[in-house]
Amino acid sequence: MSSEIEVVEEIQSNPKENGESSSKGIEEESLKNDVYTAAAYGDLEKLHRLVECEGSSVSEPDALGYYALQWSALNNRVAVAQYLIEHGGDVNATDHTGQTALHWSAVRGAIQVAELLLQEGARVDATDMYGYQATHVAAQYGQTAFLCHVVSKWNADPDVPDNDGRSPLHWAAYKGFADSIRLLLFLDAYRGRQDKEGCTPLHWAAIRGNLEACTVLVQAGKKEDLMITDKTGLTPAQLAAEKNHRQVSFFLGNARSLLEKRCDGSSPLGRLSKLGLAPVLWIMILLLLLVYTNSVVLASNLPKLTTGIGALAWLGFILATAGLFLFYRCSRKDPGYIRMNIHDPQTMKDDEPLLKIELNNPALLAGNWTQLCATCKIIRPLRAKHCSTCDRCVEQFDHHCPWVSNCVGKKNKWEFFLFLLLEVLAMLITGGVTLARVLSDPSAPSSFGAWMSHVASNHVGALSFLLVEFCLFFSVAVLTVIQASQISRNITTNEMANALRYSYLRGPGGRFRNPYDLGCRRNCSDFLVKGYNEDIECHEEDATQRPEGISMMQMQRNPNLQNGNGHVAIDVNPTHNSQSAHVHSANCSHSHNSKSKSDNVPLGLGLGLSRNPTRPVVSP
């Protein structure tokens, strides 16, 4: 049995093709002179004339059952909405589907109108006939800023289920709005909530094939989230495979395998696994130093050390030992963990909110929702990142190094770089000393073949030391050069790897731009003296970014074309056909190809979720 969310979009047809006359519905001329159109367009002067001179009512719905206040809310007409309220408009008036003006304001994220409505007494928890609150609608359309506003300032419930048991997180996961998912998880939305079909948000993201949504949910979740089955007995990975979303199926299956193999940190084996490869590297360096000392520096079958060679030999030993000390500090030091903001349920009061969000936080004002960490429950700095291995957010995250069993970040990158630098210098010196000592053996034969045989039989330790050092030197040297280059440009390994994803690394025109690069000399001096590079705020605005503001170019109303919730189709782009979404009720079904999905968000509020039990199972 197949599991599916269906969104059927109807394209507005041409009246000529259907043989319809221009007289169908309400005349266009009359539309231009009613309070509803004036409210939608924000024509306050015309609205004033219609209400105060012609006696038009603002408290009555139009022929389709919608209020003027709803139209003004949809298009963020604040002045018009204020006028309508002052002249009898009811902020809690509902249309035939139970929707209020607040529902309509959530469609396009009209925060200003929503704030006005709520200040005038609008119910933030008002539900329509489908159980949708404003938070559901905002999640359906990816209006993250709207969600943040009504939850943080007006205590809207970010995890309330609708009539089908689906929370805003279900909707955001299905629609693939990763930023909304981050915010909802940040607000402690329940990842494991199952709707009437037994589906969690991860199930719906998998069905739709939204890889980014699945990634955010998995990173913030646990192994159990991947193992939950719906009423058909399928996990998210199996549903993704059924829908032929192979990349999502592979990701979910691989994530489950990794989490299942991860040992419990409280067990002896788990504590041992947390040590990583640091003990291996530590033992390797100690063994190399031991072999170097016994088989090269103090070797009895080699000539006595001269003053110059002896000084170099012990300098290499000292550098390697100092590198070991820095290696220990790097592996044990706090790399820049950011304090987690997780409440203790036992000490929380019943009326205390799970999390308090600062509305004036620069990250939220700028719309940088990727700075929200759903695991640590913090708004992390711009250059910080959550490490999946350490399960903590790290300031100026560079990378997680398994060889030091720790992250490399703002507070330990100095030790990490100097450790690499000292070890490279030590390998150069000790390798050169070893080669010089072996070549100076007076008992060695002159022919190359005989000399090799002599070295292999009489200087096994020195030869082994040279071979191991040769293998290690190039990889460590390359890593050191890369780190030095990044330090000189004040950029991290993580930023280099994700330069195309991070908006703060893009300048005008989308080209790469590092706002933190103060020049090679300043970058290097800051790092060597302070131990880290400074973060410089980037005050330049990207003109190419789409604003959160609401605008409406043109509007057309067709009384015969409605969506399932009763919203009239609105054409905001006259060069494209308008669309409306059809709500699937329990009594209707439509065939739908899950492989072809529209990335456009329907303009109506009706985005009903439905399962089609009659569809055959699609094999991957």
From Swiss-Prot:
It comes from Arabidopsis thaliana. Pfam families: Ank_2 (PF12796), DHHC (PF01529). Palmitoyltransferase involved in cell growth regulation. Contributes to the palmitoylation of CESA3, thus regulating cellulose biosynthesis. Disruption phenotype: Plants have various developmental defects, such as short and branched root hairs, short roots, small rosettes, short stature, as well as defective male gametes and pollen tube germination. In low light conditions, short etiolated hypocotyls. Lower S-acylation of CESA3. The double mutant tip1-5 ixr1-2 exhibits a reduced plant growth with stronger developmental defects phenotypes than each single mutant, and associated with thin cell walls and reduced cellulose content in iterfascicular fiber cells. One of its GO terms (molecular function) is protein-cysteine S-palmitoyltransferase activity. Its EC number is 2.3.1.225. It is an enzyme of class 2 (transferase). Residues 371-421 form the DHHC domain. The chain crosses the membrane at residues 277-297, 308-328, 416-436, 462-482. GO terms for biological process: cell tip growth; regulation of cellulose biosynthetic process; regulation of secondary cell wall biogenesis. Expressed in root, leaf, inflorescence stem, pollen and floral tissue. SMART domains: ANK (SM00248). Interacts with CESA3. The active site is at residue 401. The DHHC domain is required for palmitoyltransferase activity. The lineage of its organism: Eukaryota, Viridiplantae, Streptophyta, Embryophyta, Tracheophyta. Keywords: Acyltransferase, ANK repeat, Cytoplasmic vesicle, Golgi apparatus, Lipoprotein, Membrane, Palmitate, Repeat, Transferase, Transmembrane, Transmembrane helix. Belongs to the DHHC palmitoyltransferase family. It catalyses: L-cysteinyl-[protein] + hexadecanoyl-CoA = S-hexadecanoyl-L-cysteinyl-[protein] + CoA. It is found in: Golgi apparatus membrane; Cytoplasmic vesicle membrane. Its main location: Golgi. This is Protein S-acyltransferase 24. It comes from the Eukaryota. ANK repeats lie at residues 30-60, 64-93, 97-126, 130-160, 164-193, 197-226, 232-261. The gene is PAT24.
